[in-house]
Amino acid sequence: MKEGIHPNYEVVAVTCSCGNKFETRSTLGNVLSIDVCNLCHPFYTGKQKVLDTGGRVQKFADRFGMFGAKK
């Protein structure tokens, strides 16, 4: 590698919104805040966060249900 053209690759303290803290290496700086990590992401935990889709579906049906009704 050429000297002086690459950013410094330093140890970074990463903090997740769930409270998990760990260290990795990055060129972004010395502190990094992230939204999800391997301890809180649904893919890794196997737990799905349930959204209020039932309420949304019902709201949609109330607003636009009359268009699909046959007479």
Curated annotation (Swiss-Prot):
Gene3D superfamilies recorded: Ribosomal protein L31
Example of a GO biological process term: translation
InterPro entries per UniProt: Ribosomal_bL28/bL31-like_sf, Ribosomal_bL31, Ribosomal_bL31_A, Ribosomal_bL31_sf
Superkingdom of origin organism: Bacteria
GO cellular component, one term: ribosome
Co-factor requirement: Zn(2+)
PROSITE patterns registered for this protein in UniProt: RIBOSOMAL_L31
Coiled coil feature spans: none
Family the entry assigns: Belongs to the bacterial ribosomal protein bL31 family. Type A subfamily.
Record note on quaternary structure: Part of the 50S ribosomal subunit.
Entry function: Binds the 23S rRNA.
Name this polypeptide is given: Large ribosomal subunit protein bL31
UniProt organism field: Pseudomonas putida (strain ATCC 47054 / DSM 6125 / CFBP 8728 / NCIMB 11950 / KT2440)
Gene transcribed to yield this protein: rpmE
